[in-house]
Amino acid sequence: MSETKTPLGFIGLGVMGEPMCANLVRKSGHPVYVADISPEPVARIGALGGHACASIIEVAQTTEIVFLSLPSIVQVEQVCTGPGGLVEAAGRVRIVVDMSTSDVGRTRRLAEVLRGHGILLILSLIHI
């Protein structure tokens, strides 16, 4: 019997996000679905074996766990609760792992909003 691996989502393929996502694609053994406002890093991750998505909604409808690597809490809020975001997609997402540098108070408020939609927000800061 073959084991089905949980599909993972990754949104934000910038300077830090793209290499982290590339490692997930290469080493995790999970299918990884990606989205970014810029098509170039999406294409590069696709060339490594990631699945390019045209929108956040497509990521949300395909994955249960989504990693975010975004510039600030502003973009995190937009991706999670804005138009075309994870909440609006009413997809499969149950866990969001935010690796962005975000304001603590706003992150706590966002966690409460997401919890109301059955989504757990995990803050996973990256220190360099």
Specify the residue positions occupied by each region the protein language model found:
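A short linear hydrophobic-aromatic micro-motif
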Residues: 54, 123-124
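Rossmann-fold NAD(P) dinucleotide-binding segment
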Residues: 56-68, 73-120
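Conserved small/polar residues in nucleotide/adenosyl-binding loops
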Residues: 126-128
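NAD(P)+-binding Rossmann beta1-loop-alpha1 motif at the extreme N-terminus of oxidoreductases
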Residues: 1-61, 65-68, 94
